[in-house]
Regions:
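Contiguous, structured surface segment used for ligand recognition
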Residues: 1-4, 10
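Active-site mouth of glycoside hydrolases
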Residues: 10-214, 221-229, 233
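Short beta-strand/loop segments at the ligand-binding rim of alpha/beta enzyme cores
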Residues: 173-181, 241-251, 258-259
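Short, conserved loop/helix-junction motifs that constitute active-site signature segments
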Residues: 196-197, 240-242
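FAD-binding beta-loop-beta segment adjacent to the flavin cofactor pocket
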Residues: 235-239
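Aromatic/acidic polysaccharide-binding cleft in carbohydrate-active enzymes
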Residues: 249-271
Length: 271
């Protein structure tokens, strides 16, 4: 009822078209399109609604191809989607349609990670395939009111950059009404690579899956060493850049995650 999501004039936050500020309270339902059937998906989204979650972040594709609980594949002819809608078949994308529209009825946005970073890093989406996939996604979902596009997927922006750029620009060429961001690797921010990209409407970072101050993992931390909760530094760094764009912590530290996920010699909670 408040209109589509836009970036505020000064670039500090997200708001609706009518000026109402938008507070992003996200839930990571990553494998929702693959693992849940219609009834389970509706139940899950309803529970999210009751708890106040207004953005459900999902992996549209976790693999190439992905298969859902109905045994339907996301691709039946590679990245050629011409015949993806088969008569009499409740296909992979029909189920995705259902999830998106069910969320819309509940006042929720779907943060669509177009494809997770792992298959792209393995070379399973070329630049030309990214263009074809982006065109398919944009044409199918440009008129849905509750889409937020996520490029990337737990991956650094300097890995397969050309593929991510091709995916983003092919979507934006068709769909200019939905916001778009880049979901980066833990303890990195999209501002490092894409702040000046015209397709990036707002930045995103992850707090990471380790203790603040734990220095074991990929070894790349674009912030000062600190043993305190320091995810605010990613906000500070991102918003110091020009042009200023809003920034979201797309994955704060999770509850019930192992105590120091990336170091097998560290303690972990097993209770």
């Amino acid at each position: 009822n408040n209109g589509k999501l836009v970036v505020s004039e000064e670039g500090r936050y997200l708001k609706h078209e009518n000026g109402t500020p938008f507070f992003w309270l996200g839930e990571t339902g990553w494998l929702l399109p693959e693992r849940l059937n219609r009834d389970e998906a509706e139940y899950y989204l309803e529970q999210c609604k009751r708890r106040g979650y207004n953005v459900i972040q999902v992996q549209t594709l976790n693999n190439v191809p992905s298969m859902n609980i109905y045994g339907q594949y996301s691709m039946i002819d590679g990245y050629n989607f011409k015949n993806i809608n088969q008569k009499g078949v409740y296909g992979y994308w029909d189920h995705m349609d259902y999830i998106i529209r069910t969320a819309a009825k509940k006042g929720q946005y779907i943060g669509m990670v177009c494809i997770w970073g792992s298959p792209v890093n393995r070379g399973e989406m070329t630049v030309e395939q990214a263009k074809a996939y982006g065109k398919f996604l944009a044409e199918r979902y440009k008129d849905e009111p509750n889409i937020i596009w996520f490029i990337g997927g737990d991956i650094r922006g300097d890995v397969k950059t050309a593929e991510w750029e091709a995916l983003a620009t092919s979507i934006k060429a068709i769909d200019k009404n939905h916001l778009m961001t880049f979901h980066p690797r833990g303890r990195t921010t999209s501002a490092t690579w894409f702040n000046n990209a015209p397709w990036l409407d707002f930045n995103m970072f992850q707090s990471g899956h380790r203790r603040y101050g734990q220095r074991f993992g990929d070894g790349d931390y674009p912030i000062e060493e600190n043993t305190e909760e320091d995810n605010w530094r990613f906000v500070e760094r991102s918003m110091a850049m020009e042009p200023m764009k809003p920034v979201i912590d797309g994955e704060p530290i999770y509850e019930e995650i192992p105590h120091g996920l990336h170091d097998e010699n560290e303690l972990l909670w097993k209770d």
